[in-house]
From Swiss-Prot:
The gene is rplT. This is Large ribosomal subunit protein bL20. Belongs to the bacterial ribosomal protein bL20 family. GO terms for biological process: ribosomal large subunit assembly; translation. One of its GO terms (cellular component) is ribosome. Binds directly to 23S ribosomal RNA and is necessary for the in vitro assembly process of the 50S ribosomal subunit. It is not involved in the protein synthesizing functions of that subunit. It comes from Histophilus somni (strain 2336) (Haemophilus somnus).
Length: 117
């Protein structure tokens, strides 16, 4: 059986890592050992932040809904409680969109929540 030298495989692996590290600053985009660590860390950040993104968007929606409900003389928690009692099943993402882009419809929802309390 012929001897296989690993130069081709190592070169391919190095190229793959350096391609992933393209755009990084300094040695992180040029030196394999540093680039490899940077790519691993970037993957960890990406994994963590894919989960955090969901939390952050929910926080943003709640902040927007809260601001809009307070303009209509109601707190966020009472508004959500009123909607549940009025059996209005609109999620926070849609409520935030309505609060930003359709003030009249949002005011109607606030009135409906107030009447259900």
């Amino acid at each position: 059986m012929a001897r296989v030298k690993r130069g081709v495989i190592a070169r391919a692996r190095h190229k793959k890592v350096l391609k992933a590290a393209k755009g990084y600053y300094g040695a992180r985009s040029r030196v394999y050992r540093v680039a490899f660590q940077a790519v691993i860390k970037a993957g960890q950040y990406a994994y963590r932040d894919r989960r955090q993104r969901k939390r952050q968007f929910r926080q943003l929606w709640i902040a927007r809904i809260n601001a809009a409900t307070r303009q209509n003389g109601l707190s966020y928690s009472k508004f959500i409680n009123g909607l549940k009692k009025a059996s209005v099943e609109i999620d926070r993402k849609i409520l935030a969109d309505i609060a930003v882009f359709d003030k009249v419809a949002f005011t109607a929802l606030v009135e409906k929540a107030k009447s259900a309390l």
